[in-house]
Amino acid sequence: MDFEGVREQFPALLQKTFLDAACVSLAPRVATEAIQDFLDMTLHCPARSSTLHHISMDEMRSVARPEAARLIHADEDEIALVESTSHGLTIAAQSIPLTPGDRVLISDLEFLEVAVPWIQLAPRGIGIDVVPNQGGEVRVENIAERLSSKTRVVCMSAVQWSNGFRCDLEKLSSLCAEKGVWLVVDAVQQLGAIPLDVKKTPVDFLACGGHKWLNSPFGTGFLYIRREALRKLLPPLTGYMNVEPPQGGWGAHFQTPSIQPVMDYEFTKSARVYEIGGTANYAGGIGLAAALKMIHLLGQDRIAEHTYALTDHLIAGLQALGIEIVTPIARQHRSGIVTFSVGSAADNTRLMEQLLELKILVSVRYTSHVGGVRGSCHFFNNTADIDRLLEAVESSVPRKSNGPLAAKATRQNQNARGNS
């Protein structure tokens, strides 16, 4: 499958220039067809019994676990299927053994969901320290300077939502390991666009919803928990799906007269302990598995190179128009997000509305005064999409190629050549 061919999986591209995977992405046909097959099964119950029908639902959903594990080079027993990134981060906050006086470190560029689970721990005496960004970037040395003897957790996005800054996770991982600090990562703006290998970059928790760059907006994502970390956690919720299946399976178990609710159950030692059951979002897991299979078919390294080529093209085009690039230029700190600014927040919102009228989908996003018009370059996009955006921006914004923005663009371009 090539990148032009994969566009056929996304019929919305026939009507719209979709450059907003960082918000909510499009679902491919393979995912919606897999879900439709599941819905047809629920309509007709082809299994011999309702019990077998239920078991088959679990089996269909479970395919998402090995696909998610493959995405980040984890083991399947380190993966739990969760509702969203928010769900995964909340599990981390509720499971890490913290005591009054402990501190959590985040940056001021984060989406609020990175902060909210820790804010909720304030009644338990848990505090938050915030690392201020430096020109839209949060370098590991900035984080190191803010660590204290009370810091127990660093919670950080792999890619920042407002400007696409990509953290040096490998360096951050080494720092946290050296200091004995838990590392919790929000990877929702990276995975599906830029590869991440948890074997090479150890983290304790990694949460990723399916609705953005994984092209699975069906209410299911995944949570990775490093095996060594699992042994130290305090799972906040339990259900019978946390229990290892009895000999012969649950179907035979439920038909046994001697069973009682209070028995000597063996709880799973895998990340699945966070899937409480007994029913789940089957359609979401099935859609996620299908979307992940498509990503694996395309190849993550190929997707990354395609993404970088598109972002290079977009950045160069914006610079030629004298428009301020908010996103870091150097590849090692870049992702599929390109954020730019044509002036004030009102100016950027006005431009976004003009683009939406032309069926060019982008967003305006800010945090801590960092942001602007945010475009997303994904594997289903092509240079024609980027050119259409650039043409629309050029016709909507007075050209500033000879002004101060052009000079800034030139400096950014020179820095990019030195750092990419």
Residue ranges and their predicted role:
Residues 1-411, 415-420:
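Pyridoxal 5′-phosphate
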